[in-house]
């Protein structure tokens, strides 16, 4: 019988019906219309250890169910984020060193630089996909041309669309911007709207007004940023101080010692 002994102070010694261990718990002699129901509840009461095990098993089952749901929606979430189809199912990175660096720095805003073929886009997609396996981050992938076109459209439309454009970006966990600078020599001066957009994004990270992690991917060779912007020093300083920077080159270690702003320069 689960109730072994009634003690003083409204407590009793019970025998756990699952593990047969004795334990003490609150007990009041059942009375009235619900006496049979309360007595049955006492008879089925289990010990704290078995209760904790049931709760742990329940949490494990719920976590496994959440994981299965995350995996079931993974491809669709990558597509809705805007990643090109060929990068939506990245279960293995093309360039391991690049992917490892991005994974290790996934909690930061990034400026990932390197020539075509160094795995910037594929690694970003791989890391975002790995994050999506564990949670539901709000992610947007855009090439620079796509994002700039959306910004220009917002600026030239009434009803405060420019405000809502940035508000939407501010709600993201990750904004991945690809192809800001292509092959060496392809960096050309951004339009005034493009320069405004780039500075707003970089300054938002620098000032901590924007909690979104901004990942900028491109071939930022020496002088590339200067060719993009009329007044490059403020942007370069903010990138240097607020972003994790790295240069990728096939067959060589990741270079994190790059500098795009020197303290002797003044704004």
Please provide the spans of the model-predicted regions.
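A short, basic N-terminal segment
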Residues: 1-97, 257-267
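N-terminal flanking helix/linker immediately upstream of nucleotide/cofactor-binding cores
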Residues: 97-103
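Walker A/P-loop nucleotide-binding motif
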Residues: 107-125
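Loop/turn-to-beta-strand initiation segments
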Residues: 137-138, 171-175, 208-216
């Amino acid at each position: 019988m689960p109730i072994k002994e009634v003690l003083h102070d409204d407590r009793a010694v019970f025998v756990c019906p699952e593990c047969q261990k004795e334990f003490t718990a609150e007990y009041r002699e059942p009375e009235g219309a619900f006496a049979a129901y309360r007595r049955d509840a006492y008879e089925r009461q289990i010990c704290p250890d078995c209760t904790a095990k049931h709760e742990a098993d329940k949490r494990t089952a719920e976590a496994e169910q959440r994981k299965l749901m995350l995996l079931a929606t993974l491809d669709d979430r990558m597509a809705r984020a805007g990643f090109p189809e060929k990068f939506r199912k990245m279960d293995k990175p093309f360039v391991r060193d690049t992917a490892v660096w991005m994974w290790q720095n996934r909690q930061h805003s990034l400026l990932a630089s390197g020539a075509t073929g160094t795995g910037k886009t594929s690694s970003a997609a791989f890391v975002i996909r790995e994050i999506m396996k564990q949670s539901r981050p709000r992610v947007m992938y855009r090439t620079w041309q796509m994002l700039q076109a959306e910004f220009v459209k917002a600026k030239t439309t009434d009803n405060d669309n420019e405000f809502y454009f940035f508000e939407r970006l501010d709600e993201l966990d990750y904004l991945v911007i690809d192809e800001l600078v292509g092959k060496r020599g392809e960096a050309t001066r951004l339009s005034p709207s493009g320069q405004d957009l780039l500075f707003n994004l970089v300054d938002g990270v620098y000032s901590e007004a924007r909690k979104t992690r901004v990942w900028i991917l491109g071939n930022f060779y020496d002088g590339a940023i200067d060719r993009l912007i009329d007044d490059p020093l403020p942007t370069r300083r903010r990138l240097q101080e607020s972003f994790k920077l790295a240069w990728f080159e096939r067959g060589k270690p990741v270079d994190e010692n790059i500098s795009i702003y020197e303290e002797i320069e003044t704004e």
